[in-house]
Design a protein with these regions (language model features):
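Domain-level signature for soluble enzymes in the chorismate/prephenate branch of the shikimate pathway
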Residues: 1-89
Length: 89
């Protein structure tokens, strides 16, 4: 049981770091929106999104984890696009 508690505590620490990085990412997304507005660019840039997905998924060393990381990354992208759309209203 102690190992389970320790593992969960480690996960909690990692989650805290993920939250910090997510907030930082979303702050930068706001900067991207400002740029897109100033330059009359669309929210969706499929070529950038696809290249970023491929590049980052390929950074995962454990092949077993790649499909799961892809889901996480796509979730981040959707959240970013949703926020951009909200800010463009």
């Amino acid at each position: 049981m102690k190992d389970l508690i320790k593992a969960r505590e480690e996960i909690d620490l990692i989650d805290t770091e993920i939250i910090r990085l997510f907030e930082k990412r979303m702050d930068i997304v706001k900067d991207v929106v400002i740029y897109k507005i100033a330059n009359k660019l669309p929210v969706l840039d499929s070529s950038r999104e696809n290249a970023m997905l491929e590049k980052n998924i390929n950074k995962i060393k454990n092949e077993e984890y790649k499909k799961y990381y892809e889901k996480v990354l796509k979730g981040f992208l959707e959240a970013s696009k949703d926020m951009q759309k909200e800010l463009l209203k």
